[in-house]
């Protein structure tokens, strides 16, 4: 009888030990996978920023090298448009927007982009050419038909002229609203003026196509009116006083160099 009890105890010990070992292995693998996913996400973000800046990079090593050499993240106070101190490289604006102490809840009138909350501080990316800043990259986002759409827009140091646009995260309908990622559509933005002569937001997404030579007009997305409206609303918000408007005013007045 004692022999049977010993056998059962040994079996239970082996089962428990194996379970513990397996759980440790699974936990370690999950942590490793999560870290790898974060690393890949950061690398993809750097790649998109370089792309919109017009800097070609091939392979992860070159992406990191060129990003560190050519891009300077800075924090901006949305209320004043001033640079503020802080760890811009690791700042999570999405997370900050969810924290009541680090953000504001937008009123229905303010919330043109339908983002609900806006962080108090935003991150911008300065494209460096030696000691000089050649462009500034703004992260913008707004609601489309099916998804929140995230983009980077590169602006010349006049604070007005677009030099590039890339949508890097969106869930719109492929072939319709998803065409925000189409290189041909994005190319239309280059050279467009964000503001009119009175420094008011002026970019317009035009259903049926923008007039030839329009300074402010971009063709609407065919068959995707609501996504096009989402793009319009995104820029209306982020170019305004609640977004990067105060910062771009300072850029226009020579605040970068």
UniProtKB/Swiss-Prot annotation:
Principal place of residence: membrane
HAMAP family (alphabetical): NqrC
Cross-referenced InterPro entries: FMN-bd, NqrC
Family from the record: Belongs to the NqrC family.
Keywords: Cell inner membrane, Cell membrane, Flavoprotein, FMN, Ion transport, Membrane, NAD, Phosphoprotein, Sodium, Sodium transport, Translocase, Transmembrane, Transmembrane helix, Transport, Ubiquinone
Effect of residue 216 to L: Decrease in FMN binding
Residue list for modification FMN phosphoryl threonine: 225
Cofactor: FMN
Assembly notes: Composed of six subunits; NqrA, NqrB, NqrC, NqrD, NqrE and NqrF.
Single GO MF annotation: oxidoreductase activity, acting on NAD(P)H, quinone or similar compound as acceptor
Residues passing through the membrane, by range: 12-32
One biological process term in Gene Ontology: sodium ion transport
Catalytic activity: a ubiquinone + n Na(+)(in) + NADH + H(+) = a ubiquinol + n Na(+)(out) + NAD(+)
Lineage per the UniProt record: Bacteria, Pseudomonadati, Pseudomonadota, Gammaproteobacteria, Vibrionales
Enzyme Commission number(s) of this protein: 7.2.1.1
Record protein name field: Na(+)-translocating NADH-quinone reductase subunit C
Annotated Pfam families: FMN_bind
